[in-house]
Amino acid sequence: MLKNDLFLRALKRQPVPRTPIWVMRQAGRYLPEYRAIREKTDFLTLCKTPELAAEVTIQPVDIIGVDAAIIFSDILVVNEAMGMDVQIIETKGIKLTPPIRSQVDIDRLIIPDIEEKLGYVMDAIRLTKKELDNRVPLIGFSGAAWTLFTYAVEGGGSKNYAFAKKMMYREPQMAHMLLSKISQVITEYLLMQVEAGADALQIFDSWASALSEDDYREFALPYIKESVQAIKTKYPDIPVIVFSKDCNTILSDIADTGCDAMGLGWNMDIAKARKELQDRVCIQGNMDPTVLYGTHDKIKAEAAKILKQFGQHTAESGHVFNLGHGILPDVDPANLKCLVDFVKEESPKYH
């Protein structure tokens, strides 16, 4: 039994005494304890060494007091498992070779045996679960098909997604073939994470806002829905969070995927989101990560504003406090601790 299951209960929109909190990228460079480990190894080796991945996953639980842990990994491990060479240099960016731009390239990508190619993630989950000793839930995750598609086609990050969109508009069938292939791997990967012990799952669509509403409905949402439905069919009790960054105009479409919770970017009023969604799903978010550069008083004021905007909880509502994107690497850990402590103290009045 979990000692602290507030996060899971909030995702399922069950009554909780306060609002649970965790933050994206909470295991990361802002923590000196993380940097000490990173000095000895490169990023992907850290992801692939279960003992180290488990250690950094648990650091924010011990140091900051968050209500959930998220397994330390990277969304691009899926691309690598499919046969792409992935280089992640934290200060210089991301390079994937060869970029996938033709039918021949797509055919060359493999549908991997997940345990064989990504077994290190499952080992990290199993080890983390053991070491967490039921203190808090553990989140597994994957990138969404559209985001992993853009990395594959662009060969890295991109400002305008020219190659990805060229394939979408010139060769839509080819684009769907690649998206479908990636989606198949994502779904299997997420299911395996649950088998390894993940208590909840998050699907990150980091580049969601690159698409128009109609294109998002055609090239992104069907694949998210495919994964969500597969998870819900096999593991109906495992909550699924969808984070389609900055897709504020199609919230109800995202809710229609069958997800339990939706991550909200910081550029939308959480009250408006709740009103539109009518408590159909739990809302996760949505403080601007740069607020954590502010004074403790400013951090508390902004957190109080979000809690107040979300408003009083009902029998159907759910809110998990989070940032609208990942925590930035140069934030003072004391500022995050201030936020976490404040949300724990301030939120009970809304429950």
UniProtKB/Swiss-Prot annotation:
UniProt keyword annotations, A-Z: Cytoplasm, Decarboxylase, Lyase, Porphyrin biosynthesis
SUPFAM superfamilies, A to Z: UROD/MetE-like
Coiled coil ranges: none
EC number: 4.1.1.37
Catalyses which reaction(s): uroporphyrinogen III + 4 H(+) = coproporphyrinogen III + 4 CO2
GO biological process: protoporphyrinogen IX biosynthetic process
InterPro entries for the chain: UROD/MetE-like_sf, Uroporphyrinogen_deCO2ase_HemE, Uroporphyrinogen_deCOase
Pathway(s) of this molecule: Porphyrin-containing compound metabolism; protoporphyrin-IX biosynthesis; coproporphyrinogen-III from 5-aminolevulinate: step 4/4
GO terms, molecular function: uroporphyrinogen decarboxylase activity
Alphabetical list of Pfam families matching this protein: URO-D
Places the protein is found: Cytoplasm
Family of this protein: Belongs to the uroporphyrinogen decarboxylase family.
Family matches, as HAMAP family: URO_D (MF_00218)
General function of this protein: Catalyzes the decarboxylation of four acetate groups of uroporphyrinogen-III to yield coproporphyrinogen-III.
Subunit structure: Homodimer.
Protein name, UniProt field: Uroporphyrinogen decarboxylase
Species the sequence originates in: Prosthecochloris aestuarii (strain DSM 271 / SK 413)
Organism lineage: Bacteria, Pseudomonadati, Chlorobiota, Chlorobiia, Chlorobiales
Gene: hemE
